[in-house]
């Protein structure tokens, strides 16, 4: 190997694993769910990785044990910041995600509202019609300025995530997933993986028990 080629090879290795190319492919401890733009300019700066269902999903978790304010958990995109601010026994959903070690990685967290929406858009489990009052997401890549249509997004092509698949999100009556984004002092945002409903305008009361699925970020 020439010196120039060897330098290129070493540089490639220093920047980590090859970038993911297919939604749902195994990647960095979980599965590739899409890109996010923390600046909201359609330029992706992180790959979003959803945790394996068997080790990174929890059920019957409260957002908080009381319906009171969480001033550090208001961002629609900063899941790591939201989640870290709630890493205690008063916040079972965030604490579950923050405590995970999967694939040697310890930086799992409860996704923010716009992060979990990307998971729904790219990894939609069912063929059920979408709601048309949710879907705007400035942090998606590309950004989406309009709500869903009945048929968009469609069911994912990632077979492990469709109904009955080993990685599929839970669907069915009242099967919401918590985000780490507070909607009001007493409520937090959720996502319903049957239809994409984010339960506007402010979500569900924090004391409710719903599902959680951890994610992590990998810099682009």
What does each model-identified segment do?
Residues 1-15, 219-220:
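Short, intrinsically disordered N-terminal pre-domain segments
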Residues 3, 15, 67, 84, ...:
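Compositionally biased regions
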Residues 12-108, 175, 186-189, 200, ...:
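Extracellular adhesion/carbohydrate-recognition regions
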């Amino acid at each position: 190997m020439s010196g120039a080629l060897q330098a290129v090879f070493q540089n490639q290795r220093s920047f980590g694993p090859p970038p993911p190319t297919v939604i749902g492919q195994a990647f960095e401890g979980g599965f590739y769910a899409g890109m996010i733009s923390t600046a909201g300019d359609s330029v992706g700066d992180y790959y979003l990785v959803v945790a394996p269902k068997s080790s990174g999903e929890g059920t019957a978790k409260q957002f908080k044990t009381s319906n009171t304010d969480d001033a550090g958990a208001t961002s629609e995109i900063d899941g790591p910041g939201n989640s870290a601010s709630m890493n205690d026994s008063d916040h079972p959903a965030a604490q579950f995600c923050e405590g995970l070690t999967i694939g040697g990685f310890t930086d799992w967290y409860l996704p923010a509202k716009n992060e979990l929406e990307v998971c729904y858009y790219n990894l939609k489990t069912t063929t059920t019609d979408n709601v048309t009052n949710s879907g705007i997401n400035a942090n998606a890549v590309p950004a989406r300025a309009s709500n869903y249509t009945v048929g968009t997004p469609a069911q994912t092509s990632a077979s492990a995530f469709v109904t009955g698949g080993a990685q599929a999100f839970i669907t069915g009556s009242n099967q919401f997933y918590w985000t780490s984004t507070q909607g009001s002092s007493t409520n937090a945002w959720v996502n319903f993986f049957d239809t994409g409903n984010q339960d506007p305008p402010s979500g569900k009361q924090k004391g409710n028990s719903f599902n959680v699925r951890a994610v992590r970020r990998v810099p682009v």
